[in-house]
Amino acid sequence: MGNRGMEDLIPLVNRLQDAFSAIGQNADLDLPQIAVVGGQSAGKSSVLENFVGRDFLPRGSGIVTRRPLVLQLVNSTTEYAEFLHCKGKKFTDFEEVRLEIEAETDRVTGTNKGISPVPINLRVYSPHVLNLTLVDLPGMTKVPVGDQPPDIEFQIRDMLMQFVTKENCLILAVSPANSDLANSDALKIAKEVDPQGQRTIGVITKLDLMDEGTDARDVLENKLLPLRRGYIGVVNRSQKDIDGKKDITAALAAERKFFLSHPSYRHLADRMGTPYLQKVLNQQLTNHIRDTLPGLRNKLQSQLLSIEKEVDEYKNFRPDDPARKTKALLQMVQQFAVDFEKRIEGSGDQIDTYELSGGARINRIFHERFPFELVKMEFDEKELRREISYAIKNIHGIRTGLFTPDMAFETIVKKQVKKIREPCLKCVDMVISELISTVRQCTKKLQQYPRLREEMERIVTTHIREREGRTKEQVMLLIDIELAYMNTNHEDFIGFANAQQRSNQMNKKKTSGNQDEILVIRKGWLTINNIGIMKGGSKEYWFVLTAENLSWYKDDEEKEKKYMLSVDNLKLRDVEKGFMSSKHIFALFNTEQRNVYKDYRQLELACETQEEVDSWKASFLRAGVYPERVGDKEKASETEENGSDSFMHSMDPQLERQVETIRNLVDSYMAIVNKTVRDLMPKTIMHLMINNTKEFIFSELLANLYSCGDQNTLMEESAEQAQRRDEMLRMYHALKEALSIIGDINTTTVSTPMPPPVDDSWLQVQSVPAGRRSPTSSPTPQRRAPAVPPARPGSRGPAPGPPPAGSALGGAPPVPSRPGASPDPFGPPPQVPSRPNRAPPGVPSLGAWRLNSPQGKHENRAGKARL
């Protein structure tokens, strides 16, 4: 390793894993570890048991590992195990460890083969292990059993992906030697998440269970199916050995004997077996941790910074002792009052750019929604004239009137003024709704104190409801005042003498087309929604609304005018949204049943939000475009059908002049009333409702809270908030401790360099067999080339039968190469004769293809020269 500090890297990661496992998944740290993946019954758990030297993992048929097991091996003088979920309890009997794993698995997954991604953390202290951190994962399977869901294959795959996709996770791909390696589930998933092979280590199990005459030598030499980090072979205990109580110490000795005695593996014996695998994994994991420490430190620091902000908020709002609760309550009430005032009055700091504040919404109600509601009550022209004619006739009675009666004017005006009550009361209701919404927005900061938040909302809302009655009484009083006296001497009232003149002036204005003053009321983007697909579909244009017309342009530069529409005889109506449309639509139509735009009876205009629609409607009101009344069509049809009630055909010229005079007078006086109401309503609501509520919050809210009872009850935190605060504080301290520990580690040691890349394109080929079972790499001896006998002999001697064609040495015995001169990089030390550079003609380990190839002929000539 180079220094003691580097040897402590793996225990450091173990401590980090324990710390962050204890506080839950919120840490989301990519800690360095080794994930053991493989198919079902590939021998993953047996490899881990060999590491520990004890039987401690559940065994059986089918899927046995049903939850991830985070196994932390720690080199120690004493031997025992600890579970994270059983803190303080030491397990010295490893049979109890097995039972605890099974019991903990069943607690989460059930007893009938269910799986769960929640890991079990097990730490094993032993003098027989090296420092390692491994994760034993469920074996990949295809067919569900027991109560497993039909998608068990994908659930297990998703669980594996949670571990192996992390860049800091080494992948221990376990594959049995007695199955096709190219179809290995472990290597497939490793290739998918680690295409460069930088994190994958291959392990070949069940070498002793291969068919007689076959071996996996070329695979273990990393020649046939190469991996960048290579392969390591191990021999686990068979089920017979386990049933016979063969301990792992004896199994490791048998494994060592197997590699030393097997003719295909003895030259690799020093690089095979469980002890060597454990050593390699320790070295690789340590180097991997060293390489990933800088990134881990940066991630810890960034998480610490984000947590510090939240922890500071908890410090500001968390009273830890009863003496501070009163002070904290006072601070929160003051903060609530300030927030409420800022949302109503507006503020230059911390401006919300995503939605309108309460004050801005109330402003829209005062100056857009309320005027629109007033005009929606606009009287129908024909109905109004009919009512005026009836009033004049009824006032005259049996007599024929010579003058226009002013009582008809007063009767009609009072009837119209009474209609204003409904929009005024609706305006109060809308403002109250916005005030209550603003109160709830301001109390969001108190969500960690649910009792205080609930009580504060109740007190303020109750006060608003109390002021609602007082405000509505005052509004009704304003309407009654208007009804009490008709001020026909008002400076804005045209009077009887000017009524006829005004009618004549309006007619002249229409004919002359007054172009001297054109007031632009509104500009903005709108979408024409009802253009057919054949004509281009819906398009967005820049609209300009004036008192005379509505124009739209290609863009907001207003250079290319598309169309101009006069606002005379136009009205508004709402249009329902389409099935797939998210826009809000309103339409313009002509009251004289004419086409509005080209061959369209109505012009449908679309906005992104309902607020924009309301704002445009208010702008159209200023231009004299009023909304369609619900009963317009019905009343018009009734009037046409009822000929006796139609005054259009029965009015004499004198009555018609009188009706027109009264009509102008009513129009003039109602304009004065509407102007007065539009001016007084915001003032009344501000004085009686909004300002009064602000004053109540500043002066009386705290006293009302104190009168509710025990302040300690009000200041009780919610269980969820207390738990979250405790979790964040634990994580905060864990992150600080982790950064402190990492800062003390010396990471200057030179690690083993990464092996060079290899050609691993074989992983994409599904027909390559598992190991070097035969010279032709066939999975079964029956598929050998016909020129070579099918079975491998038990020794390195010549095989029976005639020598293959092209053999230069015939049946000569094998000639060992000189010590130290072998080109085989996997050979043993020089004092032991290395593997022959060339094979006798009957040895199928090299194959007839090598002897027939130019390379084989070159080796034959080299052998003759040495002889």
From Swiss-Prot:
Catalytically driven reaction(s): GTP + H2O = GDP + phosphate + H(+)
Post-translational modification note: Phosphorylation at Ser-774 by GSK3B/GSK3-beta leads to inactivation of receptor-mediated endocytosis in non-neuronal cells. Dephosphorylation at Ser-774, through the EGFR downstream signaling, leads to activation and regulates early stages of clathrin-mediated endocytosis (CME). Phosphorylated on Tyr in response to EGF stimulation in cells expressing truncated EGFR. Phosphorylated by CDK5 leading to synaptic vesicle endocytosis (SVE) activation.
Glycoprotein among keywords: no
Segments of this protein annotated with the region G3 motif: 136-139
UniProt EC number: 3.6.5.5
Modified residues (Phosphotyrosine): Y80, Y125, Y354
Basic and acidic residues composition-biased segments: 856-867
Family statement drawn from the similarity comment of this UniProt entry: Belongs to the TRAFAC class dynamin-like GTPase superfamily. Dynamin/Fzo/YdjA family.
Subunit record text: Homodimer; homodimerization is mediated by the dynamin-type G domain which promotes assembly-stimulated GTPase activity. Homo-tetramer formed from two dimers in the absence of lipid. Oligomerizes into a helical polymer that self-assembles around the vesicle membrane, when associated to the menbrane through lipid binding.
Protein known as: Dynamin-1
Organism: Mus musculus (Mouse)
Gene (name only): Dnm1
